C-alpha cells in the first residue's frame, strides 16, 4: 500500500486532492499543524490516525466547511477557499453523523438534496430512484427517515453524498452501524466508484476493512502527516505472524527447533505469534516447519498493513515525522 505523506503534495497535479502545508487551530489548540498529501483519482486513499489526530478537522477543510489558517488545498485543481462554489458540486461529503430530516421520506430527502445542485424536479426524482437502488433502501424509500436504524441512516448519508455524481468523495466512518453484509456491499461499491476514476478519501477506525479497500494511505498524528521516510521505517520493523498447526502442542517445540521463540496466544492453546523481520523471514520459517513435518493449518500476519504501520509509527519514539 502506498503512503502519500508529507513531501508529495506538489508536482502540478491537478486531478484528485492535493494538500500542502495545511494548518488549522481553534484558539490555542492546534488541530491540524502540518498536513501535506495527494489523494489520486481512481483509487481509495485511507486517512489513518488515532483519536484527536486531526482527521475530522482535515475533512471539514476539504469539504469547504472550514478555512485553513495556512497552506493550500486543491480539489480537482480548484482552490476551495477562493472558489468554494466551484468545488462543492464536485464533492460528495459524508460526515460521521448527519441529520436526516426526520419528517421527510428517504425518497424526498434524496430528491431535495439533488435539487439543491440546481437540477430539475423530474431529474431529481429519477436520480433519487437510482440512489435508492444503489444503496439498498428500496423497501424504505417512502418511509420517514426517523424510522431508519443507524446503519440505514449511514446508507442514506452515502446516497446523499453521491447525489450530484461527484468526482471526489470524502467519507468519515462510512461503515459505522452497518451489518457485515452491508459492509461488504459498501466495500464493493467504493471499489467500483474508484474504478470509474473518482478520488475517494476515507477515514475509519476499522483498519482491517480499510486494508481491503485502500490502495494508498495518509497517516496522521497530532495534526501532522507522517513522512515517507517514517512510513518506510515503520513498515520495515518486525511484524507478528500467527501460526497454527494440526499437530497441537508439537508446534511450540517445532518452532523452537528452528530457532524461533514463540509467544503463546492466550486465547488459543494451539496457536502462536512469531516475530518476523520481513516476508522473506516468514517464508523461511514456514518452509522450515513444513520440511520438518509440521502440519501448518494457519500462517498469516497477525494484523493488517495499516494497523502494523500505524503501530510502528506510534512506537518509533519520535512521533511520526
Provide a role label for each language-model segment.
Residues 169-173:
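Catalytic Walker B motif of ABC-type/P-loop ATPase nucleotide-binding domains
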Residues 144-148:
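Conserved ABC ATPase signature
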Residues 63:
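Helix-to-loop junction immediately C-terminal to a conserved catalytic motif
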Amino acid at each position: 500500500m502506498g503512503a502519500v505523506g508529507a513531501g508529495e503534495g506538489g508536482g502540478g497535479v491537478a486531478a484528485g486532492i492535493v494538500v500542502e502545508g495545511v494548518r488549522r487551530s481553534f484558539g490555542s489548540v492546534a488541530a491540524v499543524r502540518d498536513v501535506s498529501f495527494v489523494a489520486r483519482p481512481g483509487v481509495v486513499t485511507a486517512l489513518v490516525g488515532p483519536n484527536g489526530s486531526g482527521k475530522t478537522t482535515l475533512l471539514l477543510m476539504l469539504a469547504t466547511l472550514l478555512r485553513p489558517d495556512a497552506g493550500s488545498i486543491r480539489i480537482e485543481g480548484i482552490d476551495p477557499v477562493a472558489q468554494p462554489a466551484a468545488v462543492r458540486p464536485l464533492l460528495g461529503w459524508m460526515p460521521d453523523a448527519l441529520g436526516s430530516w426526520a419528517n421527510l421520506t428517504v425518497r424526498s430527502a434524496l430528491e431535495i438534496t439533488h435539487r439543491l445542485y440546481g437540477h430539475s424536479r423530474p431529474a431529481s426524482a429519477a436520480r433519487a430512484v437510482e440512489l435508492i437502488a444503489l444503496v439498498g433502501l428500496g423497501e424504505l424509500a417512502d418511509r420517514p427517515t426517523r424510522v431508519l436504524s443507524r446503519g440505514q441512516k449511514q446508507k442514506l448519508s452515502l446516497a446523499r453524498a453521491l447525489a450530484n455524481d461527484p468526482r471526489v468523495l470524502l467519507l468519515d466512518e462510512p461503515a459505522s452501524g452497518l451489518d457485515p453484509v452491508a459492509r461488504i456491499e459498501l466495500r464493493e461499491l467504493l471499489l467500483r466508484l474508484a474504478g470509474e476514476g473518482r478520488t475517494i478519501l476515507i477515514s475509519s477506525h476499522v483498519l482491517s476493512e480499510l486494508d481491503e479497500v485502500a490502495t494508498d494511505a495518509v497517516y496522521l498524528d497530532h495534526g501532522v502527516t507522517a513522512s515517507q521516510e517514517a512510513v518506510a521505517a515503520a513498515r520495515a520493523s518486525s511484524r507478528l505472524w500467527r501460526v497454527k498447526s494440526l499437530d497441537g502442542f508439537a508446534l511450540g517445540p517445532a518452532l523452537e527447533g528452528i530457532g524461533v521463540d514463540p509467544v503463546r496466544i492466550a486465547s488459543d492453546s494451539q496457536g502462536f505469534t512469531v516475530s518476523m523481520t520481513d516476508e522473506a523471514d516468514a517464508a523461511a520459517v514456514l518452509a522450515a516447519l513444513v520440511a520438518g513435518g509440521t502440519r501448518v493449518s494457519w500462517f498469516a500476519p497477525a494484523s493488517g498493513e495499516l494497523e502494523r504501520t500505524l503501530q510502528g509509527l506510534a512506537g518509533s519514539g519520535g512521533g511520526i515525522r
